Amino acid sequence: MLELYFQGPVEGRKEQRQREDRQWTALLDSAKKGAGPLAVRWIDEISEAQSGFLPYLRKRDREAGGNLIEAERLLTLGVRILDALPSEKAPEPSGMPARYLAVFAAEITGNPHAFDAGTKDGKYLEMLVEWYVRRTGTEDGASGGSRGFPAFRKQRLYLKTGLLRDDVSNYALAAGIRARSGSGRIHAGMEGFLEEGEPVQIPLSAIAGWKSASCPENRMYIVENPSVYAVLCGKWDRECGLMCMNGQPRFSSLLLLDLLAESGTEVWYAGDIDPEGLLIAQRLKRYYQGEFHYWHMSAEDYKMCVSAEPVSQRRQKMLEKVEDPELKKTAEALQKSGKAWYQENMLRVYLEIFRREEDRGAEESEHGR
C-alpha cells in the first residue's frame, strides 16, 4: 500500500543511510580532484573518520537544508584554504611571509570579513588551522609558547600557518634591537635605529618574519610604564636594550622575548607594585625562557617609595594569586600598607643602570689592554 501511495518502493532508514554515505563518498572524492597534498591528506582523514570534520560538515549541511550544497561549498573552501596557507608556500618557516587574515580572506572568498571572529566560516578556519598545526608537528611550540598567556594561543596557532589575526595595534616598543630576517640577512631598519640611538615601534608583521633578535651586551631592561621608558630612552646611549610593555604584554612583545631568549639575553623587568603590576611581572617570569630578574620590585624597594594611592579591598584580593617567592614578600608589604607604588617614583634609581653599564664597559676596556 505504501509503495502504491508513494508510487515506488519505500526507502527504509538503512537504505537512506547507505544512499547518503554513497553521496558523501562521491562528494569527498570529487573534492580531492586538483587538491594539493595537504588538502588530500585532510580529505582522506575525513573519509576514514579520523577527524571531527565529518560530523561538523554534516551539521552545517543540515542547517543549510541538507541537500549537500553547503557541504560541497565547505569542502571546496577547505581545500582552497589549505592549499593557500602562507606556510605551505614558503621555502622554510623562518622565511615565511606573514599574511593579514583579512587579506587572506579576501583572496580566498572575495570577502575580507569572511573569517571574522563569531562567524561560522571563522570557526571553520580555526578548525582547519588547529588540524594543520597538529598534523605538521608544530602544536607543542604553539601551546607551550603561550605559557602564562593562554589568550595568545589562538594568535600563535594562526601564526604557525603564516596568518596574522591582528597587527595594527600589535607592536613592541623597544630600543637597541638587532635582528636578522628569515634568510639570515641583517635587518637594516633595526640597525639604523640602533646606530641613531632611537627607540622604535616594531609591528607584529616584522617580528613574525625575523629569524633572530639580540641587544647590546645581551642585557634587556623592560619597564611597564611609557613615561618611565621615555625618560630612560632620553639617557640611553646604546649600552643595553630597552623595552616598554605599556601594561599588559602584547603578542608582539612576547614574540620578541622568544627571540631574545634564544639569543641568550638576560632580562631585567620593572613594573608597578600594585596587584595588576605584580601579576604581570609573575606571568612574564614564567613565560621567559632565559635568565629573568625582577628589577627593583622587592619589598625593600616598595617601602622606599610607597605612594599615597590606596588599593581597594577588591584589588587586594588579586594578591592571593601572587605565588612567586620574591614577589610574595612584596605582595605582603603591599597588603599590609594598602597603598600602591608606581614606577615614576623610582626614576632616579632606574637611571643608575646607565652608570653601571658605562662602568662595566670601561672595566672591560681596561682588561682588554
Regions found by a protein language model. Give the residues of each.
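Nucleic-acid enzyme cleavage-core boundary/entry regions
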Residues: 1-244, 249-262, 276, 282-283, ...
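Hydrophobic/aromatic beta-strand patches that form the interior of the parallel beta-sheet core
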Residues: 221, 243, 268, 293-295
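Acidic beta-strand-to-loop metal/phosphate-binding motif
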Residues: 265-274
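Structural alpha-beta junctions
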Residues: 265, 287-293
